[in-house]
Swiss-Prot record:
Its main location: cytoplasm. This is Ribosomal RNA small subunit methyltransferase A. Keywords: Cytoplasm, Methyltransferase, RNA-binding, rRNA processing, S-adenosyl-L-methionine, Transferase. Belongs to the class I-like SAM-binding methyltransferase superfamily. rRNA adenine N(6)-methyltransferase family. RsmA subfamily. Its EC number is 2.1.1.182. It comes from the Bacteria.
C-alpha cells in the first residue's frame, strides 16, 4: 500500500482493513444527525453492529448507557475491541465475533415483547446477508437504524413497478416498515467509499400484523421469480403451476417479477406451503 493510501485509510492510529469492509465515520455533523434520527433514551437495550473506533458509540453511550444498562456492541476486529474496552469501560459491553453468526435475540429482555434496538454502520460487503440474518430476530426488535450503501437502501424502499424493486425489497418489506432517513456523502468517511451512503430506519411489523407464511417458502418463490428479471413470470414461476391455480388466484403471469406487490407473493407462498 502506498504512503498516501495508508494516510487516507488511517484514523486515530488505526488503518482501515479492507477485508472487514472498514470505512470509519469521521464527520461530526453527520454523526450528530444520525444520533438525532436514532433518538436513544437512557436505559434502553441497544446493540451497535461494527462500532469501529467509536464515532457513533460515544454519543450513543452519552445518551443511553448506564453501568446497569450498558450499550452492547458486536465487533469482529480484535484490535478495535481492545481500544473500545479501554475507552468506554463498563458502559460498553463488547461481543467479539461475526455479526452474521451472532444471536441478537440473546440481548433482548426476557419474554416475548420486542425490547431491542439495533444500530450500526454496516460493512457494505456483507450488508445484504446481514439484513437477512437479522430477520430471524425481528420479533424481538423495536427498530433498526443502519448506514448502508445508498443503492441498497433504494432497493429496500423500492415500490413495485420500479427497476430497484427486487428480492431484497420483497423479503424485507414483508417484515418491516422501511424509510430512508438521511443521505451521507463519501467524504464523511475515512477512507471515503466509492459509493454514496444513506441511513435507513426499519420497524418490524408485530407478529399479529404479518400475513402467516413460511418465510423459507416465500424466499424460494421470490428467488425463482427474480431469477431471470427480464422474463415473464409464466417462465420463472413455471415450476409452481401444478400446485398454484394462478388464474383463480387472480395472479397475472404476464408480468415481470418487479411488477408484483409483496402481498401477492405472500399469497402464492401460502398456497405452495399448504400443498407441500
Amino acid at each position: 500500500m502506498s504512503t498516501s493510501r495508508q494516510q487516507q485509510g488511517r484514523h486515530q492510529g488505526h488503518i482501515a482493513r479492507k477485508r472487514f469492509g472498514q470505512n470509519f465515520l469521521v464527520d461530526m455533523g453527520v454523526i450528530d444527525s444520525i444520533v438525532d434520527v436514532i433518538r436513544p433514551q437512557r436505559g434502553e437495550r441497544m446493540v451497535e453492529i461494527g462500532p469501529g473506533l467509536g464515532a457513533l458509540t460515544e454519543p450513543l453511550i452519552e445518551r443511553l448507557a448506564t453501568p446497569e444498562a450498558p450499550l452492547h456492541a458486536v465487533e469482529l476486529d480484535r484490535d478495535l475491541i481492545g481500544r473500545l474496552k479501554t475507552k468506554f469501560g463498563g458502559l460498553l459491553e463488547l461481543h467479539a465475533g461475526d455479526a452474521l453468526a451472532f444471536d441478537f435475540g440473546s440481548l433482548a429482555a426476557p419474554g416475548e415483547k420486542a425490547s431491542l434496538r439495533i444500530v450500526g454502520n454496516l460493512p457494505y460487503n456483507i450488508s445484504s446477508p446481514l439484513l437477512f440474518h437479522l430477520t430471524s430476530f425481528a420479533h424481538r426488535v423495536i427498530d433498526q437504524h443502519f448506514m448502508l450503501q445508498n443503492e441498497v437502501v433504494e432497493r429496500m424502499v423500492a415500490e413495485p413497478g420500479t427497476k430497484a424493486f427486487s428480492r431484497l425489497s420483497v423479503m424485507l418489506q414483508y417484515r418491516y416498515v422501511i424509510d430512508k432517513q438521511l443521505d451521507v456523502p463519501p467524504e464523511a468517511f475515512n477512507p471515503p467509499p466509492k459509493v454514496d451512503s444513506a441511513i435507513v430506519r426499519m420497524i418490524p411489523y408485530e407478529l399479529h400484523e404479518l400475513a402467516p407464511v413460511d418465510e423459507r417458502v416465500l424466499g424460494e418463490v421470490v428467488t425463482a421469480a427474480f431469477s431471470q428479471r427480464r422474463k415473464m413470470l409464466r417462465n420463472t414461476l413455471a415450476a409452481y403451476r401444478d400446485s398454484v391455480d394462478f388464474e383463480a388466484l387472480g395472479f397475472d403471469l404476464q408480468r415481470r417479477a418487479e411488477d408484483v406487490p409483496v402481498d401477492e407473493y405472500v399469497r402464492v407462498a401460502q398456497i405452495v406451503a399448504a400443498k407441500a
